[in-house]
Structures are given as structure tokens and as C-alpha cells.
């Protein structure tokens, strides 16, 4: 599957960086206030009168393509539509047939379930940064039935993570990932306002995970050959927007993103929301901020990565089932969720890891968009029985 020319292309294109015009909303819709730009592209700009001149066209009702919008819910503000009913009402976007009349997940040639399973096996084999049995030791303890997951009973007297080798977490992708985890307010309703340093940390993580690993380059090569992206620059920028672009989960505040929800975790309505990452679990458990109660699922894998569904409290806030891939590298987690979201947005995505099936459930954020009507990631997680 690897193509030498593609790797050369990747290096060349990455050097172009993430370039945006300072006075345009192209590729910036919904992103948090950034003083490095001369104008802004989120809902707050309407209140503060500092929107870019193309804000309405780019961010509100200007979507004229179905790329990234297949099967989206009807929105009367959109100029054209990309769901199964648009043909009946004669209001499909002009590229609906080319992009959505297949199960391709967003453009180019059809991406079949077999394609996804095949590339997930390749990514699994390429995860050279995953934990080994000597670098990570877990202590699952109490296994509960699905009917008991809401009981909020602490059935495990010891932490889940018995030992994690510190040198594992100092590797470049782990270090870059940890740097981003510290940048969020966990309570929904609190505005996320990033400093230039924090924005730089987001880009560093994407670079380390996707451009500086063979695993990340393989994911791009797959999506490139399927026609989903025309260049690595487009791929990296889209990852940045779908994962780090901000939207509002509560009270019209720009308080959330796919990355925060899935990897860092949030508190909403008095309970834990999201939180599907083993590294965040470990660091909070080590600090005494997280109390592991039990698990309701432990996957069939006998080496890392494994998959678990866990019950726990985070500073007193309960999570009934927090599923996560355990012991994988940050780039593997990021790549699997990205693969599934890009190819199966809002659906179940069937992967194969070492010959064993893993189902990832993805959800799209349907209230706001970025770019030409593309949707942010709302959630993605292992679907455990």
C-alpha cells in the first residue's frame, strides 16, 4: 500500500504549513478567537462586530458542496442539501450524486468496509509506540454486568494502572499529546480561549502524530489514494479543524471540541461526558483525581492495545461506561478515530485489529460547521457490548 512518491509528497506539502489568509474565514469557521488574525469566524464575532467579510458566506449558509456533509440533518439555512430526501425535493447540492451516492464517507472512490478493515490492520501493525507488557501493567479487578454499570459502587480497591514506564510517556507523540491535554476547562459552559502557545501545541501534536510517524503517513496515503484529500496539507488542516475547532455544548459558549470531549473529557449535567483515552485516565488516577470502580468489558486482545469499558469517578463526577483503547500510542488512537470519522461519519465503523473486530461509533456535530459545510467531531469511542 505504501507509495514512495506519496511519502515525498507528504514531506513537501507539510513544509507549506497551515497557511490561512488573515482576513478570511476559509477553513476557520467555528474556531476560537485568535488574536493572530485580523478578524474572527465564530458566533462571538457577530456580537463583537469583528467578523471577517466572508463570515456569512463561509460559515453560515454558504455550503454548496456535499463534501463532508453526506446524510446530514436538514437545515433550512443551507443553500443545498446532502441527505437521502434532497432528490425528492430537488434541492441537492450539485455534487451530491458524485459524493454521497456511495458509502465512501466524503468523496473520491468508494471506501468499503473491507478497505477500512484492511487499513486498520496495517495501522495496528505500524503502532511501534504502543506499550509493551513490561512498560504497562493494568489491574482490572471487578468485572460487572451491564445491568450494574449505573450502581456507582466502588468494587476495586486498587488503581487500574499498576505501572506505567515513564520513558513511554516521554516519547515525542506522547509528550505532544500530554501538552495539549492541559489546555482545557473541563466544565461545559466555560469558554475555551487558547493562547498562541496552546494553538502551536495543537499543530505540534498533529505534526508529530500524523507527519512524523509511519502510521500517520499510512493513513494519509490511504485517504489520498481514495480521493478523500488532494494533498497532505489539506488532510492536516482538515484534521486540525474537525478535532480542534470549537463549538458550543452549553449556553452558547465556545466551550468544546472533538479533541477535548474524546481525549480530555468534560463535565456536563453533573456527570462525566466523553473521556475515552487511557493516558488521560492514567494521569488523573496517578494524581488522585480519578477513582476506578470496575469494568464491564475487556476485549479479546491479550497484548496491547486492548479495549475496556470502565466505571469511575472523576473528582466526584461519575462515568457509567468510559470505553477506551488501552496501551496504544496517541497517534494510533487519533488515527483510528480519524479514519472512522472521515469514512463513516455518524455511523458504526468496523475495524480489524490482529484479526479481531473492533467497532468504533462516531457522532457528528450538527449545529455548526467549518469550511464548506463540514462537520466537527462530536464524539468517537469503542462500542463495547
UniProtKB/Swiss-Prot annotation:
Residues 1-21 form the signal peptide. GO terms for molecular function: lyase activity; metal ion binding; polysaccharide binding; RNA binding; RNA endonuclease activity; scavenger receptor activity. PROSITE patterns: ENDOU (PS51959), SMB_1 (PS00524), SMB_2 (PS50958). The keyword NAD does not apply. Specifically expressed by the exocrine pancreatic acinar cells. Endoribonuclease that cleaves single-stranded RNAs at 5' of uridylates and releases a product with a 2',3'-cyclic phosphate at the 3'-end. The UU and GU sites are more efficiently cleaved than CU and AU sites. This is Uridylate-specific endoribonuclease. The lineage of its organism: Eukaryota, Metazoa, Chordata, Craniata, Vertebrata.
